[in-house]
């Protein structure tokens, strides 16, 4: 049964990826920070950095051929929801790949739901039942039936974070290690996880 937010077309009316990136660009270029809230001021450096990350991935990424074949096998309309925010480093390192992958099949309608203004939707997809972790990808058919989920990080990246936290590493340092991992991986682990998901979900 479809969720109420799907029935109410909130997902269908959410941002396209192009709109999301344009908003991110404009937010990263604000010159007068005095007009921002305290939270927006705090997030501003991350939005700037994440816009650079997104731009680099969009410029350099080339899809894996096996994944491309699976994406092209999707033969009926799907809507892919990604819950995200511009300040989130994990979103910047994963969402551009998801967007470029989705581009290869016109039957995939990718929509970006902003977490902080849609917490009721986010709370349907908590990590471990407690954490509002993003990005979160959820795919639906045109009737709102859920097809698959992914997120908020590739499994290997999540295991790295858990290990470093358990070793007592400070947040600033383990985030640095995490983004070094993303830089080396270049989306390949995400691709492999999506390949496995699609192999199991494509009828």
Report residues per predicted region.
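Local sequence-structure signature of Cys/Sec-based thiol-disulfide redox active-site neighborhoods
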Residues: 69-100
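Beta-rich catalytic cores
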Residues: 133
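Thiol-based oxidoreductase modules, predominantly thioredoxin-like and allied folds used
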Residues: 80-85, 98, 106-122, 140-142
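Non-globular targeting/processing and membrane-anchoring segments
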Residues: 1-77, 123-130, 142-203
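Short, surface-exposed basic-aromatic patches at helix termini and helix-loop junctions that form
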Residues: 96-106, 128-130
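Conserved beta-strand and immediately adjacent loop positions that scaffold enzyme active sites
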Residues: 136
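A short linear-motif detector with a strong N-terminal bias
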Residues: 58-61, 89-92, 115-118
């Amino acid at each position: 049964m479809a969720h109420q937010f799907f029935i109410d077309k909130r997902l269908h009316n959410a941002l396209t990826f192009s709109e999301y990136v344009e908003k991110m660009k404009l937010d990263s270029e604000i010159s007068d920070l005095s007009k921002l809230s305290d939270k927006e001021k705090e997030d501003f450096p991350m939005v700037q950095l994440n816009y650079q990350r997104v731009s680099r991935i969009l410029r350099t990424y080339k899809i894996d051929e096996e994944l491309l074949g699976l994406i092209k096998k999707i033969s009926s309309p799907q809507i892919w929801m990604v819950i995200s925010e511009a300040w989130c480093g994990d979103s910047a390192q994963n969402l551009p790949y998801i967007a470029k992958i989705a581009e290869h099949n016109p039957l995939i309608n990718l929509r970006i739901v902003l977490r902080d203004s849609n917490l009721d939707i986010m709370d349907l997809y908590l990590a471990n039942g407690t954490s509002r972790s993003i990005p979160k990808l959820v795919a639906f058919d045109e009737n709102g039936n859920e097809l698959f989920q992914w997120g908020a990080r590739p499994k290997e990246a999540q295991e790295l974070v858990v290990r470093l936290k358990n070793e007592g590493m400070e947040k600033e340092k383990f985030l640095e290690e995490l983004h070094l991992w993303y830089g080396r991986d270049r989306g390949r682990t995400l691709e492999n996880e999506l390949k496995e998901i699609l192999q199991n979900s494509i009828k």
